[in-house]
Amino acid sequence: MSVLTVEELHSALALRDLTDPAQGTHAVQLVVDSIRTALAAAWPYTEIWTRRDHPVVPLADNYDNLGYATDAVTREARYTRYVSDNEVLRSHTSAMIPPALRELAASESSDVLMICAGICYRRDSVDWQHTGTPHQLDLWRISRNVTLGEPELEDMIARLVDTVLPGQVYRTVPAVHPYTIHGRQIDVLLDDQWIEIGECGVAAPHVLRLAGLDDSWTGLAMGPGLDRLMMLRKGIRDIRLLRSTDPRVAGQMLDLAPYKAVSSMPPVRRDLSVVVDASADVSAEVLGDKVRAALGPDADAAESLEVLGETSYDDLPTSARERLQMTPGQRNLLVRLVLRPVDRTLTDAEANVLRDKVYRALHEGPVLELIV
């Protein structure tokens, strides 16, 4: 199993959690506050528990205690950042729920709304709405006073959307999660495209039982993406802007007023021809993670990464095979990298240095075609 190095762990933990007021003010916190206020008004007799845990969590709370199968693909190191055999950087804020449920089981409380916000760590694609360090919010109402089911879930969904995105058209579609029954995905309409903002469901009885809550307890579970909600609320079309240090942008990340675009930096495109093994995982998530790791502190300069084409060894011209020194079973990928920092313009020389870093991270062949 691949485990993070000490340097990689320190780098991950050093990244600012935009949901944490102790690390500075950010509009993401206003989204959380507005949801908390709306649900508190809807459920005046429900206790509110706000939880903020360290991002290094037990593997069991990230997966097992939420009902994930032992062979679930999401457990693999290509998707999860392992700190040790038994600890991970949480891949979702749902990892805070099992300890909260255990605390509830040991308490005298009978109706609680658990609010868990924080940064998460994933391996994800590079595009305008994805990042490897998203911010998520888990909202779980657990009660033995009232029976919570699908009607209450529908009401909770409506209150969430009406609070953060008033007037927005939305829909729900069936979704499967190991920690819910009657699972749903929540989408909102942006222009002519449905954009996912979160998932939810009725809390799965087996998850409650694992925490020591008997069958008198029922619950609702919801996990909206905070970055996505804020971007839709403010009209932001680039997730990297949420962390921008450009004063013209950063000043607008303190409220929920519509975003006013600043002058756009020109994109720099570089097409890469790389060789990969037949067994290589070339999914957008895995390639995106390799790009971010390769660029390090310059990772936010990558606006997008797209595989334009794939050619097998057998389908390549002999001249191309010889030039790349490919062997049977390997593949040639044509990858387009778009570089565009949100706060400055790259020179050609700077772009070429970044291009070569990405090339080295993706290319598995013996011949290096570097620019610098």
Regions found by a protein language model. Name each.
Residues 28-43, 139, 152-165, 286-293:
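Amphipathic alpha-helical segments
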Residues 178-372:
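A carboxyl-terminal module marker
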Residues 149-184:
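Extended C-terminal subregions enriched in glycine
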Residues 144-145, 149, 162, 229-231, ...:
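Long, well-ordered mid-to-C-terminal structural blocks that present hydrophobic/aromatic surfaces
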Residues 134-144, 267-272:
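Short, flexible active-site loops
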Residues 1-130, 136, 141-142, 194-208, ...:
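Class II aminoacyl-tRNA synthetase-like tRNA-binding/catalytic domains
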Residues 39-46, 108, 161-169, 294-305, ...:
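Short secondary-structure junctions
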